[in-house]
Amino acid sequence: MLTIGGKQFQSRLLLGTGKYPSFEIQKEAVAVSESDILTFAVRRMNIFEESQPNFLEQLDLSKYTLLPNTAGAATAEEAVRIARLAKASGLCDMIKVEVIGCSRSLLPDPVETLKASEQLLEEGFIVLPYTSDDVVLARRLEELGVHAIMPGASPIGSGQGILNPLNLSFIIEQAKVPVIVDAGVGSSKDAAYAMELGADGVLLNTAVSGADDPVKMARAMKLAVEAGRLSYEAGRIPVKDYGTASSPRDGLPV
């Protein structure tokens, strides 16, 4: 069970809702993923314009928790303003803080992310900041009181997978709040690996929406997250330099 800000969720897979080939494919992929939490960019949604298409109308919202994000923000002030818009729409008081510091790499701005998170916490939001795999920054965010930490595996949409498993392991080891690996996941292998490292969840979008078959990939991600979590809980065998026979010779008659 994944718990964020006092809310409990069965699925540890958080799914983004952007860039699907069609509303129909998006809806089917969401259903197959069995995700409880769907994230979307407030700036790309027509939450106040009824005459414009809105993917939220295609879903049974009673089945999901919506996680608006502040994608497009370059400063703390912009992120806070976007978060307030999302809250004013009545969708949710949970917000993914995303403040991009580099338009080419799409890496987050650590200073502005800290500032935005602090302000939104003061305003009563459930705050989930998207951050780099900086171990110290993750600790600083937790000290502020954020409800989860979302370190990137690699740049957003890059599909490079987990580039720095050591740092992610350090973040997971020290954190007292959920750690959700976010960004850069390219395949089910990456999702399973993140969970095997001990992450509490995985958030992804492009890996599903950009796949040749988004619906099939959504199912693959669901199974990968479940398998990775089970593997972590089971406890893997230690890595050794040399082989160890699985059938011991002690006590054999010959």
Swiss-Prot record:
Enzyme class: transferase
One of the record's GO molecular function terms: thiazole synthase activity
Residues that hold 1-deoxy-D-xylulose 5-phosphate according to the record: 157, 183-184, 205-206
GO CC terms in record: cytoplasm
Active-site residue list: 96
Entry's EC annotation: 2.8.1.10
Keyword Transcription in record: no
Subcellular location: Cytoplasm
Keywords: Cytoplasm, Schiff base, Thiamine biosynthesis, Transferase
Pfam hit, one: ThiG
Protein name: Thiazole synthase
Organism whose genome encodes this protein: Bacillus velezensis (strain DSM 23117 / BGSC 10A6 / LMG 26770 / FZB42)
